[in-house]
Regions:
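N-terminal, polar/charged subdomain of small-to-medium soluble alpha/beta proteins
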Residues: 1-96
Length: 96
């Protein structure tokens, strides 16, 4: 899986970059065919936004969260992404 961590309007500290990459690695347990995950971090007016764009063959998922804390934004976006993946994997299992 290719993981890209990008920041808008600020430079990402290494510990935040490592934290985001570590959290994204946890998504492999849902589907091992994940090919790419983009983590877009931005900061505007005391709001930190974390956006996750996840793709694997034939499917794309997106989650976006804004909070006052960057790590909290990453955690909440990850929770939303896990929910999307659980729902999708449940639908796949029902059809097969």
């Amino acid at each position: 899986m290719i993981i890209e961590v990008t920041a808008r309007h600020f430079n990402v500290p290494d510990y935040i970059r490592d934290y985001a990459e570590q959290e994204v690695q946890k998504l492999k347990k849902f589907n091992d065919r994940i090919t790419r995950c983009q983590v877009l971090l931005s900061h505007e007016h005391n709001q930190h936004t974390a956006e996750l764009n996840l793709s694997f063959p034939g499917q794309r998922f997106h989650s976006k969260v804004s909070t006052e804390n960057l790590t909290k934004s990453i955690d909440t976006a990850m929770t939303k992404m896990e929910h999307h993946l659980r729902k999708y994997m449940g639908k796949l299992q029902k059809h097969y």
